Amino acid sequence: MKASIWLGNDKFEIRDVPIPEIMDDQVLVKVKKVGLCGTDVHITQGLFPSTPPKILGHEFSGEIVEVGKNVDNQYIGKRVACNTTSNCGNCHNCNNWTISRCSNEVKSSGAFAEFSVMPLSSAIEIPENMSYEVAAMTEPASCCLSGTEMIDYKNDSKILIIGSGIMGILCLKFVKQKNIGYVVVSEPNPLRRKMALEMGADFVIDPRGENFQEDLEKLRGEYGFDVFIEAVGNPNLLAEGISHLGPRGQALMIGVHPEMSNLAYDLYDLHYKEIRLFGAFGRGDSFSSVPKIIESFGLEKLVTRTFNLDEINKAIDLTAEGNGMKYMISP
């Protein structure tokens, strides 16, 4: 099969490699669509730990074309969203509902390739009318669902989201399903601001605008925001967002921050206002339920452009620039 091998830094090479062998409880998936993720960019920039050479790609969908001997042949031909990790169900973390930190997790083979292998439990059948593009967003959507479910909402909650890239938009869609007050999205990119409005934001503001602080003060009100979601992965934006929370406010880190980064914030204020800070990493147990939930979200409009496998460098560069929404690879 053809695969894009990451060789370190921003170097990729298309190679012919053997199709992965499947174990008895596994399935072989023909990869149809792979989403480019900010983590893929961070890996090429040395901001996220990973060791080359390897096949990257973890947001993907496809069709089951072969099954192991312990898997019923009825699964051949099923259209699936693919979870890149599977948990053991037996370790301390799994038994305490922190399956994203499973001590014995098994990773599927990377998806920047024509085929990928995984346990049957990691291949979730998608709705009949769902496109492979939307199905490939199951992975980031499950991270956002797992994170937003950590929050306690009230029927008058005022929510601030900083960043309306894919993670910000997905968080927006999930919180708008709650019985809440309103959602404010802060985003400098005009295309992404427009997308946030189309996807349900009540207010959208430009942090580079002349009246930004004045507008934000009006929207936060006398007592501050109840919930803040940082969807960029920038420690300075995390600190800024926390400063706009009211007493007992809740902050959710959904953006991936660089390793060894620090939060420059007045800990007295954090303590005095009883702020609750949540780190959200991984998909929890939400992955299998996500395809049906996002079916009605209208996520097709988030796909900016699809590239062939040998155009991966262009797709990585455009993702890093942050001017589009979601770029896809079609192996």
Can you say where each PLM-predicted feature lies in the sequence?
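Short SAM/SAH-binding signature in class I
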Residues: 225-229
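Short, well-ordered loop/turn sites that connect or cap secondary structure elements
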Residues: 74-75, 153, 245
